[in-house]
Amino acid sequence: MSFTVVIPARYASSRLPGKPLADIGGKPMIQWVYEQALQAGAEDVIIATDDKRVSAAAEQFGGKVCMTSPNHESGTERLAEVVEKMAIPADHIVVNVQGDEPLIPPSIIRQVADNLAGCDAPMATLAVEIESEEEVFNPNAVKVVADERGYAMYFSRATIPWDRDNFAKQDKTIANPLMLHIGIYAYRAGFINTYVNWQPSALEQIECLEQLRVLWYGEKIHVEVAKEAPAAGVDTPEDLESVRAIVAKQAQ
């Protein structure tokens, strides 16, 4: 089973400008992500960017680049442009790996591709069991519930499912496992264009979760439990320092 990884990499991050080029252990962040994707066994790895500085950095380490429009409103729109420009066949599997996850395990990149290959959905993703009370009630931690076959029923920033009896207690015991969504997706390439041509749905606008558009229009997303929990991505200067510390420790 072959698959392609596309890594959207925007230079203009509001919280951390120039994020793809941030130095981590002597390499730009985007190079870390690229190398993790190669280790996953991808047939092709493509960096999708709208900035020549990112493109130039990628070319220095031998990365393959697709220049994209600066006007995309989402990473999925950027993905659709790559599929069109690179003439990726409709039945080919494309994995979208965020450009700010330098420590993403190659195993889960491969896993989400295998997940899609083994089901009849046009899209697949991963989740891990929530272990901390803080994440259960944190709206930035997106929860997912799936049916008995692993197809997503809903994604939410709210606490789903709501454990009525246990959450009524003062200590809000986590008696039943809740699943935390991991933001990595595999798509059948032909579906990406279908997705971006749908109008945004009311639910995705309320929750600010793009994947809800897929469920709104009656399509399926298959969810599998990740074999390995990924490290946190880099959204802030503090996150960047944490990743640098991890890399420095591993190098010792």
From Swiss-Prot:
Belongs to the KdsB family. This is 3-deoxy-manno-octulosonate cytidylyltransferase. It catalyses: 3-deoxy-alpha-D-manno-oct-2-ulosonate + CTP = CMP-3-deoxy-beta-D-manno-octulosonate + diphosphate. Pathway: Nucleotide-sugar biosynthesis; CMP-3-deoxy-D-manno-octulosonate biosynthesis; CMP-3-deoxy-D-manno-octulosonate from 3-deoxy-D-manno-octulosonate and CTP: step 1/1; Bacterial outer membrane biogenesis; lipopolysaccharide biosynthesis. Keywords: Cytoplasm, Lipopolysaccharide biosynthesis, Nucleotidyltransferase, Transferase. It comes from the Bacteria. It is found in: Cytoplasm. It comes from Vibrio campbellii (strain ATCC BAA-1116). GO terms for biological process: CMP-keto-3-deoxy-D-manno-octulosonic acid biosynthetic process; lipopolysaccharide biosynthetic process. The keyword Cytoplasm applies.
